[in-house]
Amino acid sequence: MSQQGPIIVVSSAERPPFASALDEAKLFPVIDTNWADASRAVAQLAPAAVLVASPVAAEPGLDALARQIAATIPYLPLIAVDPVTALPANAIPFTQTGGNFDRLVARLRAALRVRTLHSTLLRRLDGDPAARAALDDTDPARDATVLLIGRGAGYPSLSVALGERMGVVGALSLEAAAKHLNVRDIDGIVLGEGFSPRVEDAFLTVLAEDARFRNLPVVLTSGALAPAYDLPNLEILSGEPAAVAANALPLIRQHAFETHLGRMLKSIEAGGLLDSRTGLLAPAAFNLDFVTAVSQTLAHGGGLSVARFAFDPDHPRAQLDGARILSRLMRQIDFGAAESDGSVIVVFAETDLRTAHAISRRLSSVMR
């Protein structure tokens, strides 16, 4: 993979073992530096990624380095290997290495794909300063959705800690979780207490075997299993709910950012007809399509039905989640748009009123 720049490894002592693993994976050039020179190296070398070997004690330069990296465009991944202290908000933790860094290489490749996607979008937006400014102001965590699975005593506290940072969808069973994964845009999974190691192992195995979910951030809050799965963004994080949520956020934010970039690219390819946040039509495009559909139905006959899904305008997140679910579940012949009053309008082509009622009820049941 061409990473469009070197990989900088920051450490306070001798060269960390994972740097050699990067060499063996042919992710070069790999440049070693210490904390005193790290900021200058990032500024001068324009790296594709920065990996830090977390020191035993808190490193005062980490926060400043993280702020510098967060302001870098295009997206610059920052990965902290085996951290022992609290991390900045944009530092992705990588723990439980056990001397095997294959999963680190896979995680780095996944992060580099996000960087490449960001670079591609920036090229497409060249000459459109308004769209570029909107992208730069995007907060991926604001629209992120995490699937919290569990039924143990720590579930309520973990739900609150995650909910303070992003949207949360709860599931008390793995069966309910599977349904959410199939109908919602999920940016990460947190697997809490309440399941045996055998059940957890089966769930992780299924995720690893499904290409749709393989790159999802997955956080285990118990240490009963080793991270020996083909899941590059699998983390085992134990501790207080607030610490688990804080350490899970960077991985989830990265996935949400990747999804947002993909939607924006699709919108550009569609000539700006799609809303990059929801995947539905932009309002102007919807109005044009609706007028055309009505005219054709009046001229040639057939069925045409319209459904309005109302959401609380004081909670715009509900409309966003509902719109994304609808964009995933609608038939290809249907189209819709999110309206400014908090509702979502969907047009069912070639559909009579009775069938439209049945479809709308099914869609509503999923969005509850």
Regions found by a protein language model. Name each.
Residues V9-V30, R151-L174:
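Two-component/phosphorelay signaling modules centered on CheY-like receiver
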Residues R15, T33-S39, A48-Y75, P83-V84, ...:
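Conserved phosphotransfer microenvironments
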Residues S20, A58-I73, P77-D102, A106, ...:
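Alpha4 helix (beta4-alpha4-beta5 surface) of REC/receiver domains from two-component response regulators
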Residues N90-A91, T97-R132, A243-S267, D289, ...:
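Receiver (REC) domain switch/output surface
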Residues T145-V146, L280, G302-P313, G336:
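Active-site-flanking beta-strand signature of metal-NTP-handling nucleotidyl enzymes
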Residues R263-P283:
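Amphipathic HAMP/coiled-coil signal-transducing linker helices
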Residues A270, L281-G302, D321-R331:
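Short regulatory alpha-helical coupling segments
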Residues L273, A299, D321-A356, S365-R368:
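Conserved helix-loop-beta segment at the catalytic/binding core of cyclic-nucleotide signaling proteins
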